[in-house]
Amino acid sequence: MTATGAPDVGDVADQDAAAQAAVLRGLPSQAQLWHWIERLNGFGPRLTGSPAHAAAIDFLAAELQALGLQVQRDHLPLRRWTAHATHLALDDGSAIAVAAPLPYSGVTPADGLAGELVWFDGRPRSFRKARGKIAVVALRRRDLDRTLLTLAFKRKARLPDGDADVASPITTPLLTGLQAVALDKARRHGVRAVICVFEGVSEAQLHGQVLPFITPYRDLPAVWVSARHAEALRAAAAQRRQARLTLHATLQDTTTDTLYAVLPGRVQDETLIVNTHTDGPNACEENGAAGVLALAHAFAALPRAARRRTLVFVLVTGHFQLPQIGVHGRQATSAWLQQHPQLWDGRGSHARAVAGITIEHLGCTEWRDDLAAGAPAPTGKLERDLVYTATPALDALYRQACAGRSKLRALTLSPRLEVAMLGEGQPLYQAGIPVVATCPIPDYLCQVLPEGGIARLDPAYAQQQVETFARLLARLDQRDAAQIGRIPLTPGRLLSRLIERLR
């Protein structure tokens, strides 16, 4: 203790070391973490509200209950769209391979629907010329380049070196896939169906992409096809020929569950939130729940007296159907925050969340699309971990928690606009909760893959990521709220709030 009464730097370091050691003793092994990841992946694609997703949620609930935690469920209504089969052919019978349907687009009659093809170069301002016809829209891949990254984010630490930064564009189907085509506009203009031709992406990379996942049901069938079919479709449209599209899908009213569990600490008026989502198409998207289980194990192993604050573990549903689950289309955790203010907003007798940790997409290795080869291939690198650190103190604490790692490739950043923040850490940030959120974006993030693409994950990398968050959470529990800090009120945050009020 210093003469002013503040903790001595050496005392803080000793307390951190002791707290971290205690937590790491209770942290499950790499083998156990990998077992959980394999179990989740073993359910198959866990798209929102599907039987596989429900089974995975039940499994996670049982694992938390086995720790002695009381698991609560929020039952959320969902109108679930499920695609069963697709087929596309020109009027001469030549088949056009469908890479994937656009989620929640629409459904055709059993024998499909036929219409004249109308070609559009890029996203059209108007679909009027395709009224009563099938629109074919060519979309060029948009990458996350350094300019876009600078406009959207403030880049901070590069760990362990400059290779974690973005020297060349991050090639990804995600940005173009999320934007896709304005199906609502096309439907208003009387379009019968839409074919999206994705340029700059190999057919193997495009196959099974679940994009976009941020749009509601549009009642307009739409599919992705690869660029190898572009010339055939363009030529057919120029000759005013027809095609027949079949998209067999069902709509079902059901429910889907968010889980949360509270682990009490010495004080009840301050909480730390650890969250992720449970729905996704493959082994990496979403395996964050395995990391949440690991942290729950580590902290539940401590005596209550060793936990300063109450921990709240939140596993939300709805990330892959944000229009139905998220509040005003925000990320799915926004629904949980809205329903449980007593655990975070600090008003009246409510507890205040002094910090949050969001874990997503553990253990990803880097694969990049090779158009010449016609398929993506591994680069031999770890996937760049994009880690949002909401305050300077959190950035420093995260960097300290990474010390000693042999598998590390992380770029820390903060969003200039709240909407630019990817992943389920966004609602915490929007609510003013200081958060550290990991959200790497591998090319295969939203892709249904054979065996879930689990071979693309590195178990040791996943374990070291979780160990980092265990150290970080232990340090956060030792810090006063003032030491963690508040999210700076930047011009970008003010603009985000103004936009939100105008919605």
PLM features: residue spans?
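Soluble metallo-hydrolase cores and metallopeptidase-like ectodomains found primarily
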Residues: 97-129, 210-286, 294-305
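N-terminal capping segment at the start of a domain
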Residues: 9-51, 67, 74-76, 201, ...
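A conserved hydrophobic secondary-structure block that centers on an alpha-helix together
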Residues: 128-130, 142-198, 268
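His/Asp/Glu-rich mid-to-C-terminal helical/loop segments that flank catalytic regions of hydrolases
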Residues: 309-311, 439-503
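Noncatalytic luminal/extracellular "stalk/propeptide" segments of secretory-pathway proteins
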Residues: 2, 14, 27-30, 37-159
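Short helix-loop-beta-strand segments that form the rim/entrance of peptidase-like active sites
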Residues: 35, 299-329, 486
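Metal-dependent peptidase/peptidase-like ectodomains
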Residues: 269, 317-431, 435
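Second-shell loop/turn segments in exported
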Residues: 19-27, 42-51, 115, 119, ...
